[in-house]
Amino acid sequence: MLDGALYLCSFGFLYLLKLDELKPEFIEKPLKMLKNGLKYLKENRLIVHLIFLHAFVGITAYDALIALLADYKYANLLSTSLVIGLLNASRSISLMFAPALLSKFMNKKTLIYIYIGQGLGIIIWALSLRNFYLSLIGIIFAGFCTSSLWSYTYTLLQQNCQKEFYGRVIAYNDMIFLGFSALISFAIGFLYELGLSVEMIAAFMGSLFFVGAFYYHVVSKRYEIR
């Protein structure tokens, strides 16, 4: 009921919003827009690299891993819904407050350390998974760099994209990001079916950010990022 009421309120505000003065500057046919957008990506490889650098944040879509923890590893401690809720609540603490601490240090030179920090945070969480209450602390480390990494890589993409292609590039970016997140969720289930422990899966996910750090180092040396 509450969700429905919120949707009705939002539609009401949207209906009352006056957008008469906003007119599109660039009008193209859909197929031509798609063709020109893909051509723009082909001619601007930096944009493609920034899209994939942002997609690394999709590794943090470990909801499937949390579900496995709740259903199997911590099943005898608390109810599934309570385990999932507590883990997500603990993670949200760092997602909310860490950006305020890291924003003073975020720039193109320090971004590589944010990738490394994200990887180390997930590995710390992996080491704490043997104990549920320790994992509530460990997941705070896992989420400490996530918001800053997501927002800064998104900002880099915006700053290095031409205005007329901005909407298309953001659409491609979201498509790659969501696809990467779905792939990670599938990989978690697949690795678990192969017999890997949740600790090993989490540690593997953290190590992927070291690949992201190296990838960013190569891109920053090869291209001039604004």
Where do the model's predicted regions map?
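A single, central transmembrane helix in multi-pass transporters
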Residues: M1, K39-M96
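Hydrophobic alpha-helical transmembrane segments
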Residues: M1-D20, L82-G85, A89-S90, S94, ...
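Structural signature of the two symmetry-related core transmembrane helices
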Residues: G4, T110-I124, A203-S207
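Substrate-agnostic recognition of the 12-TM MFS/MFS-like secondary transporter fold
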Residues: L6, G58-D63, S94-L95, P99, ...
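Juxtamembrane intracellular "pre-TM" segments in multi-pass secondary transporters
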Residues: L19-I51
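Helix-to-coil boundary motifs at intracellular loop junctions of multi-pass secondary transporters
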Residues: L69-N76, L156-N160, L194
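Helix-loop junctions at membrane interfaces in 12-TM secondary transporters
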Residues: A126-I139
